[in-house]
Every structure is written in C-alpha cells, then in structure tokens.
Amino acid sequence: MSKIRLGVNIDHVATVRNARGVNYPSPLKAALLAQQNKADSITIHLREDRRHINDLDLKVIKSKLKIPLNLEIAATKEMLKIALKRKPSFICIVPEKRQEVTTEGGLNLRFKTNFLKKMIKKLKMNKSRVSLFIEPNLRDIKLAKDLQADCIEIHTGKFCNLIINKKSYVAEFKKLTKAINLGNELGLEVHAGHGLTYESAKILSRITGIKEFNIGHFLIGESIFDGLAKTIKKFRKIIK
C-alpha cells in the first residue's frame, strides 16, 4: 500500500491571529514549519468573507512554499480570477455559506453545473489540478468525473462525528469505502478530509485508495499542547 499524503490545513492559525486583529501567529510560519516537518502539502481556504486566510496570506505562502499548495475556494468568478493569478498546485472547489462556522457538507454538483465545468477547464489549462469537495455518494462521484475534475475530496465529517460521539460507524465506513473504490475505478485521485482526528484518520487509513488526508482544525488544536512539529509527526506515523 502506498503512503497516504498528509495535507496540513493552517486556516485556524489565521483564525487565532484575526481574533485580535494583530499580525501573529503567522500562517506563513506555520506553513514553513509544517513543510520542515514532512507535511506533503499545505491547505488554505480563501473564503469570500476572508474570515481567516486573506489575500496577502495566499500571496506570501505561495511565494515561499516549496511543497504543493492546495487552495480551497468557492465556485465564484472572483475566486476563479484569484486562483488563475496565483496558480497553486491544487485547487479544491468547496461549497460556502456566509453563516456557517465551517464547511457543512459537499458541493451540490447539480447547481451551477455549466459554470463549474468551465471553471474546472480554465484551472486545468492553468496547470492546477482540480479537486471537488463532495459527499461520499456514488452519484456525485460520477458527476465529478463527468465534470472532468482530476480529484475528489470526500467529506468525512459524518464519519468523524460518529466516532467522537462513540456511536457505531460501520455503515458510514462501508459507504466511504464504496465511494473511494468508485473514485479509483473512474480514474479520480481520492482525497479525504473534514473533522479528522488521530482516531478517525487511523481507521480511515485502512481503506485502500485514499491518496491524501487534509487535516486542519484538530491538528492545529492539538499543536497548542504538543507543538505543531510533534502533532504532524504523530499524524504521519498514524497514516503511514
């Protein structure tokens, strides 16, 4: 089995910074420290409301980073323009609601389908690999293939919440396995993310065919107690 890549999402370093309106802690410093400690990529979400990562963060991190940058954006003209300018290695198109605390679910691929298809084509022509953040259902995976995405990122939030709340996750695990298998059969690169902890990442790493985990909130939270370097190394060991 090939190693699962670890993408470190540093959004919530910016959340802490913005809580006081100061210039620390530095998302760039977090990105470079993650890179130094064998993260395979860095993920940032440039939201329309700029509630954590902002345009300057994106510019500076992209210019300094040596490992791939995975930029999460909504399917809008503004974000398409920014992504085309910055040319990150990966772009993950995600749903976005202004009132949500965090991304609440996968993209509705039957909404704005024509725009999505044109957006994906432009981003791919600009040498970025494009991922769609979707629920683990077979219909959406087939639609992602039809839209000519390179990758899918499976939303693991429900599965992770079942584990956190000590409830049975067997049915959801089977659902995720079927979704991941179909993605691979269709030639899509399969990533997984949202709500992942040490425990849930360890269980999901048993599924053959996941190429990458993107982990942020829990990882940044644990780093308060153990440090960012140690937390990244622990995740690396768990998902190897």
Residue ranges and their predicted role:
Residues M1-P88, L143, A171:
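Conserved N-terminal beta1-alpha1 strand-loop-helix module at the mouth
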Residues N9-P27, P68-A75, T102-R110, K127-P136, ...:
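Active-site mouth loops of central-metabolism enzymes
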Residues R129-L182, L186:
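Histidine/lysine/aspartate-rich catalytic loop segments that bind and position anionic ligands
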Residues R51-K77, L109-S131, S168-A192, F235-K240:
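Alpha-helix-loop-beta-strand connector modules within alpha/beta enzyme cores
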Residues G105, I164-Y169, G221-K240:
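C-terminal helical cap(s) of enzyme catalytic domains, especially alpha/beta-barrels
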Residues H45, C92-E100, C151-I163, G209-L228:
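Glycine-rich phosphate-binding active-site loops on the catalytic face of alpha/beta enzymes
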Residues K77-R86, N137-L147, A192, L196-I210:
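Catalytic cores of alpha/beta
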Residues I4-I10, I42-I44, L69-I73, I91-I93, ...:
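Hydrophobic faces of well-ordered beta-strands that scaffold small-molecule active sites
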